[in-house]
Amino acid sequence: MRVERHGHSCVVVRATSTLVVDPGVWSDVSAALDSADAVLVTHEHPDHLAVEPVVASGLPVWGPAPVVDLLAAAGAARDRLHQVCGGDLITPSGITVRVLGEWHELIHADAPRFANVGYLVDDRVLHPGDAYVAIPDGVPVELACVPVSGPWLRISDVVDWVRQVRPACVVPVHDALASQRGVELALTWVERLCDVDVIRSGEVDLGGG
């Protein structure tokens, strides 16, 4: 299994088939969707979902209800859209994926809340979207995608979440809102306080299928 970063929150997971998670407008969407078999979207914000390219791809898409509605309104075929919620177990293109969580992290008490789900791919790779999703007990996550910037994020919360998930390694996501120095500072704290390997390269090979 290989995991590739394609900018901001977009990650490609290549195993027996290829899944794209969160191809948003701040990502290299065309490269991410090329040769993909399915798309997983955590929530409807444009930095996680570039509507027009995803619709044009014709790929099957899994996501919470607002994502499905947004894509359908833009012309996506309904039979290619699959609504999910936390607790679901799905098999896009033959890969087992657990759907986790329910809500986007709070930005402000006066701001609206948004649906958000995380995806745990093959019990190995975790993408939380914009939330600190809980994982099932006893699941040894190999790689967690860790948000490092955003209006809803504090590095202390990130550290606590990584400690709870206890992945073998992490890759940074949700980084377009920070400078490179800011991203590196966040990763330094995660590395220092979580006893975890931080992968700074664009891709990582986890081995196996």
Which residues make up each language-model segment?
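Redox-cofactor binding/interface segments in oxidoreductases and associated redox assembly factors
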Residues: 21-22, 40-41, 98-102, 146, ...
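Catalytic metal-binding/acid-base residues of hydrolase active sites
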Residues: 45, 67, 103, 132, ...
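Active-site metal-binding motif and surrounding structural segment of the metallo-beta-lactamase
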Residues: 25-70, 141-145, 166
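Core dinuclear metal-dependent hydrolase active-site scaffold
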Residues: 1-34, 83-140, 152-154, 202-209
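Short glycine/proline-enriched coil/turn segments at helix->beta-strand junctions
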Residues: 15-17, 34-36, 56-60, 76-78, ...
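Active-site-proximal segments of metal-dependent phosphoesterases and phosphodiesterases across multiple
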Residues: 143-163
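Binuclear metal-ion centers of metallo-dependent hydrolases, dominated by the metallo-beta-lactamase
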Residues: 1-4, 75-93, 138, 159, ...
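Conserved alpha/beta-hydrolase "acid-adjacent" motif
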Residues: 48-50, 154, 180
